[in-house]
């Protein structure tokens, strides 16, 4: 299991940050959270934001509106992830909303992404082919919003052990390590 966060940038593009530890992910998340507005009566129309424990019991209610964009630009979000020694991945670049491609109309060459994510549906439809020319490693995931969706996306990894550092090496294809979506 890798610790991670998904940031909605000021351009409303999603960026996935994966980290070596939960502490690093939490630190990055707190920096993002500090830029988000508080929950108001109007924002409550978007629904409740409960904090649940492992047994499904409500423990608290989130006071920050998590469904809005952070004030970080795309470059700043990637910089934040990297400042916590994380991997920055352009989320679901094949989707028509909240992707770098849909929001900017092109893939920025000046942003230091470690990989791109293709949605699991996009993989099934062969959309990954149009992004291979970007020269970045590809991953896929379930991008789950419901429990039933967990596990829909799969990648194959060739690594020496199951660790964050080995995953990073697989993305970079170092010494025979590999990451593939198909």
Positions of PLM-derived features:
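Charged catalytic cores and adjacent phosphate/nucleic-acid-binding surfaces used
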Residues: 2-32, 49, 65-66, 79, ...
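Short acidic/polar alpha-helix capping motifs at helix-coil junctions
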Residues: 39-45, 89-94
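A structural motif
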Residues: 42-57
